[in-house]
Amino acid sequence: MLFHVTHTHDYQTCMAHREEARNEFNDGFTKAAAANNVQIMATYNNRGRHTPIWILEAPDYHAVDKALEPILKFGNYDIVPVSAM
């Protein structure tokens, strides 16, 4: 299944200028995705809006939820199943 995931945070919680937090966010998500059989198909970022977007392939919604678990403290997540047209 494909999923469109939108992450949002605000200026105060932005990781752009906090290297340790950025590494925790990136490493935590990458490792948890691999551990839960979630493939990161594409990554996009709207820096001005503090909004990263991912296209993920996963067996189910639960796998995506588990992959995001280590980074939940960094903001909000909207997970939407999608399909190719």
Where are these regions (language model features)?
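Short S/T/G/P-rich N-terminal loop/turn motif that feeds into the first structured element of a domain
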Residues: 1-50, 59-62, 84-85
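A structural signal for short, well-ordered beta-strand segments
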Residues: 5-7, 54, 79
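Short, solvent-exposed amphipathic alpha-helical segments in soluble enzyme
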Residues: 22, 70-71
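Short, electropositive alpha-helical surface patch
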Residues: 55-68
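A common structural junction motif
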Residues: 71-78
